[in-house]
Amino acid sequence: MARLHLVVVAMAALFAAAAVAQGPSASPTPAPKAQPPVATPPTRPPAVAPVSPPAAQPPVTTPPPVSAPAPVPAPSAAATPSPQASAPTAEPPVLSPPAPAPGSISQSPTEAPTSPPPPSAASGVSPSAAAVVAAWAAVAAVAAFY
């Protein structure tokens, strides 16, 4: 008779642990219905403070016109190209990442990590599943001793 009582208590603990692990969404009571909003009386808008006139701004002066530069004659097709004409256009230099110091292990930020991240402590096992397994283990242990 005592063995049956212990098994019943262990089964009750199993169901309680499963209900706690599943959270409040698994409760047998229905969710409360939303109440319709209560109509509130209209309120008066707040008083508007008088607006001061904008401060006077100084007049904008334009700089005097600058005389146009003298036109540069276009080079003829038969003329040899001058050193200025053959100079390449200025391009911004391409910056490369600094070289790592000798003996150091470095990884550029654009490269992907070479090894996968370590698994987390609870990877693949939900808390509710862990609680159910622990409760079943407790039931099995109690039943084995009696």
From Swiss-Prot:
Gene Ontology CC: one annotated term: side of membrane
Signal peptide coordinates: 1-42
Membrane-protein topology: Lipid-anchor; GPI-anchor
Coiled-coil annotated spans: none
Tissue specificity statement from the Swiss-Prot or TrEMBL entry: Expressed in roots, stems, leaves, flowers and seeds.
Principal cellular location given in the protein's record: membrane
Family: Belongs to the classical AGP family.
Protein name: Arabinogalactan protein 1
Gene coding for it: AGP1
